[in-house]
Amino acid sequence: MWKEFKEFAMKGNVIDLAVGVIIGGAFGKIVTSLVNDVIMPLVGLLLGQMDFSNAFITLGKGDFATIAEAQAAKVPTLNYGLFINNVVDFLIIAFTIFIVIKQINRFNRKKEVKEEVAEEKATKPCPYCYVEIHKEATRCPHCTSVLESP
């Protein structure tokens, strides 16, 4: 059983997945920092010194300056600023993944076209019915004519 697990774990796909998860986690941290430390402070500056990370509405009694004060007083809060930060974070990650997948698909389409060209070169028309057949065929599958050996 250990041997089977070892073979499974050492397959290329599992290792590729592990590397992808690690890089994805690191990328997520970078994007979160970008949103929280660069983008949202600039947006807040444009909106009149607003700090989105501390934007909230209390759902109970009391007036609090920060989310931490409200939570310490056990007053429920609607933290819309943190939600906006997370939405921007998600949009950046989703757009980045979209661009990466789009490039991968574009690369795969080019590869498929090359394979199709190679397949086209592997065919020839039947001299009797003109249907495309494999270039090494000795009999046409469409009209069943016997062909000359290649």
From Swiss-Prot:
Described purpose of this protein according to its UniProt entry: Channel that opens in response to stretch forces in the membrane lipid bilayer. May participate in the regulation of osmotic pressure changes within the cell.
Assembly: Homopentamer.
Any one Pfam family match given in the protein's UniProt record, by short name: MscL
Membrane topology of this protein: Multi-pass membrane protein
Recorded superkingdom: Bacteria
GO molecular function, one term: mechanosensitive monoatomic ion channel activity
Gene field: mscL
Keyword flag Cell membrane: yes
Cited NCBIfam families: mscL (TIGR00220), PRK00567.1-4 (NF001843), PRK13952.1 (NF010557)
InterPro entries: Mechanosensitive_channel_CS, MS_channel, MSC/AndL, MscL_channel
Record has Oxidoreductase as a keyword: no
Family membership noted in the UniProt record: Belongs to the MscL family.
The name this protein goes by in its record: Large-conductance mechanosensitive channel
Cellular component, GO annotation: plasma membrane
Regions that span the bilayer: 14-34, 81-101
Subcellular location(s) of the protein: Cell membrane
Lineage: Bacteria, Bacillati, Bacillota, Clostridia, Eubacteriales
